[in-house]
Amino acid sequence: MFLLRSRFSTGFSADVAALWQRLPLLEALLNDVAIIFERDPAATHWLEVLCCYPGLHALVAHRLAHGLRDRGIPFLPRFIAHLSRFLTGIDIHPGAQVGRGVFIDHGMGVVIGETAIVGDYCLIYQGVTLGGTGKETGQRHPTVGHHVVIGAGAKVLGNITIGDYARIGAGSVVLRPVPAHCTAVGIPSRNVCRCNTQAAPLDHSQLPDTEAAAMRSLLDRIAVSYTHL
């Protein structure tokens, strides 16, 4: 995870090592770059990652805008977010809280609302919306835990919590909380929790099909009924 950091810091003095603590944006950037190499087999060179990954660009712009907003600076945070959306196709409100090591893969069409919270090392695919459900004030966007995978086109709406290591199936519409280590699939989504199973975060071929499971259960009950006739 910290391979890039070690490459840059190896052989430098303690003063340079302490510099990481004073430059949180640089620390976050190295974490974001490292997670891209870990999760994207298409990433082959650091220069390519720095120049050609819009998800990385959007996160860098957001961290800058968020920091300025926290300092009470008007206008500039929203302008940076607006410019970032124009350049990357990714809309992250400056008020959103985004953890470290987040990977926005492909990214086009991703929307993250003002009061959304995204935990560390989450994987977000293109077309994802972390949005609200109306004009309510206060916390009105989702809180996403750590190591969560949100599939392409999924919509997570309202003041709900997505637990750590949860998975959201592609195209799902999530309107209620998802417990940790569970999967939400469907429109509207249904939670499926499998005990003692740990799926690879990048493997979307093993997502549970709740409709198919219900059909199998119905067919099994019909078969049992026939045996008693």
Regions found by a protein language model. Name each.
Residues 56-105:
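Extended, small-residue-rich solenoid/repeat segments and analogous flexible loops
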Residues 85-192:
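Structural signal for interior beta-strand "rungs" in well-ordered beta-sheet cores
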Residues 177, 181-223:
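Acidic, low-complexity intrinsically disordered segments
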Residues 227-228:
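Conserved small/polar residues in nucleotide/adenosyl-binding loops
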